[in-house]
């Protein structure tokens, strides 16, 4: 499929499915210390508790929202114009950037001057690229280390708290039982955080201190002012990344923009554009201009295209030009496989699956062809100079990650991890933000060792892992094999999880696969937050459990990660609208619903003047008679 044939800029349009608010949800904005700090959240309204169960009010809950303006009915979305430059004023008022007269990248200038690309080109960008003034450093880490709390830091502090205080106050205001409701629905289990330092409330100062220490990053390139600030770090909510991108086999620019908007609708905190096909530069421009979340790339992929796929022909000059090209477009973080050293390559010879990272294999081939260390390693300090001029964060790539559980935690993988730790300290010397990429394929009992060694070697820089996949026997289900490992390593301290779709190892994911991967990983990340005891993490669980106990079916659907699928599954069995208010579910029917029985036992206890234990015994006698009369079947059709 040729992207030029499939896509014309004049015909570009937003995916209508991505701009509809989710059921019973509305976009709200929590204002910060200045009017232009407006932090988006999703408010999910709930029905009142039925009179039979007390008839109380259930105030709305607030959900972390990555969807940007797309789910705001008040926003006018035209992907040919791109999103508003939310951060432009914040960037300008710091006084440390300059607008360039032209693109600095030779390749970027070539693309801009090519009239054959006019019909493909994003038409809505009318500003010049920015770069730090001479001698300046514009990274969030640099500001943090100087004691400056930026608007971006305040923004993420508000975002991380999820309006929890307002929710608790709204519970207290529901009536005479309000304080008790606040106590019950705000309660959560004490977690096990494995040495993390998660405060009860996230403050802007805490955000600043974590970034200054290197334990967290805010990936916000100065040339991506459309992005809504978010934070990646062990002491914050676990984030997820979605991969998109075309290949030589297919996919158009329109399709990739739709994958991005679809990813963020369902909860993608960042998106990586891994395009390897035609028109990579133009595809990336469309994605960045329309993305409210950070965009990451693997620059070596595009550099390889520039030398017609011959790894040995790559040079530092080509790679450097690619970094600048992408930085001036607004890429927020680069995966750079600088830890693939010549001495590590022979260590992979006895592996079952060799080197499976594309970037890792490219650099291994270059090292062997030239018999010297890669230019990514030898020019690392020069790369740091580029990164801090645009505030691009490093995602130090694990080019030697294991591609099978057979190869997990071997000397090549762990040797590279030590080198990534050394490179982290060099980047930090330049006040450049860093996250560390991790595996891969690792059985469950070996996962914690990965986390412990990463914390040790990389001095608590945020860990970003692909899964890991915990078994290799389930092609078509690797979103599940990896979701297991993702939940575990997220609990142990990983800051961001890279999603895996059902198509992993099999083909390019479509929109349905993207959604399946996102939902699986949102679930894994949330399970990790619960296990760590992240303050407020259990609020949504408690609200949904209360709705389930009170048979508020619509609230159960709407409070879930995927309201559409929950409603679809329920309606397959009970399609009538009356079933949405039924006091039983589609599995056990009206006579044997455990929650209905519990409700009846409580009512019975009140009527008989018994405590619940005595009522339970007597009530079960009554239920046993009903069971026999109904035919003595464990499950019944309705």
Swiss-Prot record:
Keyword Metal-binding: yes
GO MF annotation, one: zinc ion binding
Gene3D superfamilies per UniProt: 6.10.250.620, Radical SAM ThiC family, central domain (3.20.20.540)
Any one GO cellular component localisation term in the record: cytosol
Biological or metabolic pathway of the protein: Cofactor biosynthesis; thiamine diphosphate biosynthesis
Binding site for substrate: 243, 272, 301, 337, 357-359, 398-401, 437, 464
Binding positions for Zn(2+) per the UniProt entry: 441, 505
Cofactor or coenzyme needed: [4Fe-4S] cluster
Catalysis performed (reactions): 5-amino-1-(5-phospho-beta-D-ribosyl)imidazole + S-adenosyl-L-methionine = 4-amino-2-methyl-5-(phosphooxymethyl)pyrimidine + CO + 5'-deoxyadenosine + formate + L-methionine + 3 H(+)
HAMAP family assigned: ThiC (MF_00089)
Function: Catalyzes the synthesis of the hydroxymethylpyrimidine phosphate (HMP-P) moiety of thiamine from aminoimidazole ribotide (AIR) in a radical S-adenosyl-L-methionine (SAM)-dependent reaction.
Protein name: Phosphomethylpyrimidine synthase
Originating gene: thiC
């Amino acid at each position: 499929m040729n992207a030029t044939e499939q896509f014309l800029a004049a015909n570009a349009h937003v995916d209508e499915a991505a701009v509809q608010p989710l059921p019973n949800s509305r976009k709200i904005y929590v204002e910060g210390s200045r009017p232009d700090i407006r932090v988006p959240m999703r408010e999910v309204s709930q029905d009142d508790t039925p009179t039979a169960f007390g008839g109380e009010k259930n105030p709305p809950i607030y959900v972390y929202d990555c969807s940007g303006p797309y789910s705001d009915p008040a926003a006018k979305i035209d992907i040919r114009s791109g999103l508003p430059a939310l951060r432009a004023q914040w960037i300008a008022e710091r006084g440390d950037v300059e607008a360039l007269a032209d693109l600095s990248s030779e390749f970027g200038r070539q693309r801009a001057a090519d009239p054959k690309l006019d019909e493909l080109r994003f038409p809505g960008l009318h500003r010049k690229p920015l770069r730090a003034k001479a001698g300046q450093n514009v990274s969030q880490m640099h500001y943090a280390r100087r004691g400056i709390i930026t608007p971006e830091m305040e923004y993420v502090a508000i975002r991380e708290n999820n309006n929890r205080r307002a929710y608790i106050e709204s519970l207290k205001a529901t009536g005479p039982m309000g304080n008790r409701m606040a106590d019950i629905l705000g309660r959560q289990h004490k977690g096990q955080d494995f040495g993390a330092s998660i405060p009860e409330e996230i403050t802007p100062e805490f955000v600043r201190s974590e970034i200054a220490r290197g334990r967290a990053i805010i990936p916000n390139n100065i040339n991506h002012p459309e992005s809504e600030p978010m934070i990646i770090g062990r002491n914050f909510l676990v984030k997820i990344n979605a991969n998109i991108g075309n290949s030589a086999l297919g996919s158009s620019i329109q399709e990739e923009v739709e994958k991005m908007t679809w990813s963020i609708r369902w909860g993608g905190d960042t998106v990586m554009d891994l395009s390897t096909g035609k028109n990579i530069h133009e595809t990336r421009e469309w994605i960045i201009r329309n993305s409210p979340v950070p965009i990451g790339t693997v620059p070596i992929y595009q550099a390889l295209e520039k030398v017609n796929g011959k790894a040995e022909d790559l040079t530092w000059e080509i790679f450097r030009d690619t970094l600048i090209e992408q930085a001036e477009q607004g890429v927020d973080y680069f995966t750079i496989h600088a830890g693939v050293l010549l001495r590590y390559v022979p260590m992979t010879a006895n592996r079952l699956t060799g080197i499976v990272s594309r970037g890792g294999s490219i650099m291994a081939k270059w090292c062997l062809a030239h018999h010297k260390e890669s230019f990514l390693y030898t020019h690392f300090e020069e790369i740091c100079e580029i990164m801090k001029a645009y505030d691009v964060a490093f995602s130090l790539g694990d080019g030697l990650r294991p591609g099978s559980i057979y190869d997990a935690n071997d000397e090549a993988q762990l040797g590279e991890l030590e080198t990534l730790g050394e490179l982290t300290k060099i980047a930090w010397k330049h006040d450049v933000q860093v996250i560390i990429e991790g595996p891969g394929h690792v059985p469950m009992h070996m996962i914690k060792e990965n986390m412990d060694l990463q914390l040790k070697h990389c001095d608590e820089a945020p860990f970003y892992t692909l899964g890991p996949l915990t078994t290799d026997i389930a092609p078509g289900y690797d979103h599940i094999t990896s979701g297991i490992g993702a939940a575990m390593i997220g609990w142990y301290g990983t800051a961001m999880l890279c999603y895996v779709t059902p198509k992993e190892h099999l083909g390019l994911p479509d929109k349905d696969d993207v959604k399946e991967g996102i939902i699986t990983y949102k679930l894994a990340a949330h399970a990790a937050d619960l296990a760590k005891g992240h303050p407020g993490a259990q609020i949504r669980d408690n609200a949904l459990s209360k709705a389930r106990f009170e048979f508020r079916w619509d609230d159960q659907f709407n409070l879930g990660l995927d309201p559409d699928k929950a409603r679809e599954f329920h309606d397959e069995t009970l399609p009538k609208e009356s079933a949405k208010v039924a006091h039983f579910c589609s599995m056990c029917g009206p006579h044997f619903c455990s929650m209905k029985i519990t409700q009846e036992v409580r009512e019975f206890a009140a009527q008989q003047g018994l405590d619940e234990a005595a009522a339970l015994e007597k009530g079960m006698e009554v239920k046993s008679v009903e069971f026999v009369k109904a035919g003595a079947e464990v499950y019944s059709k309705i």
